[in-house]
């Protein structure tokens, strides 16, 4: 007896998990990825990059956030791997756009994030959770 894969999949209801890189995969900078299941999105990094000289007048580039804007009700948190601008630089733009989700970062990255958000005067809305640094 043949079994239809789609029927088995529906019956077993396996977890649907997506890993998507918004930017930073084939370039240096603008690191931003997310993990998504049916009800949740967790971002990993929120970086920016600096344009080449031929993009005169543009100060920095951030990831394309269209998908996240459409699904902001699912965004639960942002995990920061480290405090370089190519991993935290877009936070001042991403956080307000997504309703200020929780940000998880190590102690050094946390301090850099606070400084960056003070520059943009949005530090009061930050929900930052310091993670233990592994040695």
Model regions and ranges:
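Conserved structured core elements
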Residues: 16, 29, 85-88, 107
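Pre-active-site segment of Zn-dependent metallo-hydrolases
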Residues: 27-30, 39-80, 92-101, 105-109, ...
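Short Gly/Pro-enriched turn/cap motifs at secondary-structure boundaries
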Residues: 23-25
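Hydrophobic alpha-helical bundles that form the membrane domains of multi-pass transporters
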Residues: 82-90, 132-133
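Metallo-beta-lactamase
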Residues: 2-11, 109-135
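Divalent metal-coordination and catalytic microenvironments
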Residues: 19, 35, 45, 82-83
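Short Pro/Gly-enriched beta-strand edge/turn motifs at strand-loop
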Residues: 12-18
